[in-house]
Amino acid sequence: MLKYFGTDGVRGVANQGLTPEMAFKLGRDGGYVLTKNKKDGEQAKVLVSRDTRISGQMLEYALISGLLSVGIEVLEVGVITTPGLSYLVRAQGADAGIQISASHNPVEDNGIKFFGSDGLKLSDEMEGEIEKLIDAEEDTLPRPSAEGLGTVTDFHEGSAKYLQFIENTIPEELDGIKVVIDGANGASSALISRLFADCGVDFTTIYTHPNGLNINDHCGATHTENLQKEVVKQGAQLGLAFDGDADRCIAVDENGNEVDGDHIMYVIGSYLAEHGRLKKDTIVTTVMSNLGFTKALEKEDLKNVRTQVGDRYVSEEMRAHGYNLGGEQSGHVIMSDYHNTGDGMLTGLHLMLVMKKTGKSLSELLKDFKDYPQCLVNVPVTDKKSWKEHQPILDVIAEVEKDMAGNGRVLVRPSGTQDLLRVMAEGPTQEETDAYVDRIVKVVEKEMGTNK
């Protein structure tokens, strides 16, 4: 298990857990690992960008200093979305990209996320190599003086290149659909109006005025309450909410109901399949996707492949087996015909394209998708990794699954960050589902609960 890197880069409270000193080390050590295979005399090139958090510039300058110290040429993109940086790394033929963002997390947090030359997140092995250098007793990396140092160049025109790329994936103007868009006061705030206007969309925006402190503050993909009200108030056909770095998209239908990533993938996937464009008739999701998603796909003779939690694992599965649509319930949707990572703005526009092409409202497109009631309980435990060694827990899970008789599912997994065991079930009614979870939770608490 890695010490600094989580499922989405290095994260922490800015200036406390994630300090400028740490950012410098990540720039120096990470930059070296990513570019050490360059031929002699060929200078490595790395793109650096950030979201709108007040701590972003502090960390950016420290990170860039680390990169420059090992002779790397830095292209400073400024504020842009995470998928925007991923695209630009490939488009510019850069050796790597580094985004400073904590995505949907509150403003106190920040993160540093690395991308390879392919625009994809790093492998666990490469992240481990960076960590070894960070923890080394002595810094033995090159320290050029004068001629061998790196330089910084502004690349703020990168935003325009990225927006043009997204616009080119839409074959026609998206007029006739009124949309309200929530930018989460994040990285997409300055981009939304330019992109959606160029695509002919009738739209209004909310939460697109970042001040460094208001990113994700009761807005964006994890807080859609105000967007839901605004869609109904304005009589709009659709609402779109992005998170702080706009790699997620959550929608709102014309009735003000939230539409998560499962539902968005179902709508887009069904349309692609109908036109023979869904590869292998399969959508890749994580184990967190609702059972109703799989049941809805089965009605259309489509398949669902599931991975462990994390969009990187969805992406790996898609690349390994040639699938072109996948994502997470949380709103990461990967449309690999266009992009190799989740992109909120791209997803939103393609959802609109399906609505326009079919002439149907979002609620009509989802009429055959019935969510199964879900219950999730987080149980504090003494050792989350050893839960499978407790036979009574395995037995009660098997008993519950037998009682479900194929009309429900159980998912038990340890938390990635806390000493918790997450017990989740889905079933035909909320009452039955709650009872299933309660049966399992009681055994978990008896076997390994902190209060047993």
Curated annotation (Swiss-Prot):
Keywords: Isomerase, Magnesium, Metal-binding, Phosphoprotein. It is an enzyme of class 5 (isomerase). The active site is at S103 (phosphoserine intermediate). Binds 1 Mg(2+) ion per subunit. Activated by phosphorylation. Mg(2+) binds at S103, D243, D245, D247. InterPro entries: A-D-PHexomutase_a/b/a-I, A-D-PHexomutase_a/b/a-I/II/III, A-D-PHexomutase_a/b/a-II, A-D-PHexomutase_a/b/a-III, A-D-PHexomutase_C, A-D-PHexomutase_C_sf, A-D-PHexomutase_CS, Alpha-D-phosphohexomutase_SF. One of its GO terms (biological process) is UDP-N-acetylglucosamine biosynthetic process. Its cofactor is Mg(2+). One of its GO terms (molecular function) is phosphoglucosamine mutase activity. Signal peptide: none annotated. The modification Phosphoserine is found at S103. PANTHER family: PHOSPHOGLUCOMUTASE (ALPHA-D-GLUCOSE-1,6-BISPHOSPHATE-DEPENDENT), PHOSPHOHEXOSE MUTASE. HAMAP family: GlmM_B. Belongs to the phosphohexose mutase family. Catalyzes the conversion of glucosamine-6-phosphate to glucosamine-1-phosphate. NCBIfam families: glmM. This is Phosphoglucosamine mutase. The gene is glmM.
